[in-house]
């Protein structure tokens, strides 16, 4: 099984722009089940069941999508929103550019980790490890620019990636570094 096959994407956050300006009160009426309380939060919240995602829509036309497990679900979510808004005669862009802001994924090194030894070997400039405050070791990878959270169980959480390939690169890199010093 390749490294990529062992990586599980938990969440993708992406953004786009649907228009120059949106009337959120009108959209709240068009999107059944949406939540819009401008005195509480400036955006409209709309949750989809399939794919299981949520979008935040702002008056500026900006939209954030969260909860997707793959890029196709992000695209499907945005298309569903566009179709629903157009059906309600709300003018929006046909094919807006979607930008991935963050991918969160998990990986299992399948080996227990001694985080104290790892903190010493990876170098203090890229590592934060304060077990009294947080049980994981925070490892800031410079290339690709992601953050890995390593746990004693061998589980690794990767955050900050913009592409799936960056997660795979970071996992391969940390595995090589830990193997090189005999820590896995």
UniProtKB/Swiss-Prot annotation:
GO molecular function: DNA binding; DNA-binding transcription factor activity
Any Gene Ontology biological process: DNA-templated transcription initiation
Domain of life, per lineage: Archaea
Pfam families with a match to the protein in the record: TBP
Annotated Gene3D superfamilies: TATA-Binding Protein (3.30.310.10)
Keyword tags: DNA-binding, Repeat, Transcription, Transcription regulation
Cited InterPro entries: TBP (IPR000814), TBP_archaea (IPR033711), TBP_CS (IPR030491), TBP_dom_sf (IPR012295)
Sequence repeat coordinates: 9-85, 100-178
Role noted for this protein: General factor that plays a role in the activation of archaeal genes transcribed by RNA polymerase. Binds specifically to the TATA box promoter element which lies close to the position of transcription initiation.
Family per record: Belongs to the TBP family.
UniProt cross-references to PANTHER family, sorted A to Z: TATA-BOX BINDING PROTEIN
Name of the protein described by the UniProt record: TATA-box-binding protein
Gene source species: Thermoplasma acidophilum (strain ATCC 25905 / DSM 1728 / JCM 9062 / NBRC 15155 / AMRC-C165)
Gene: tbp
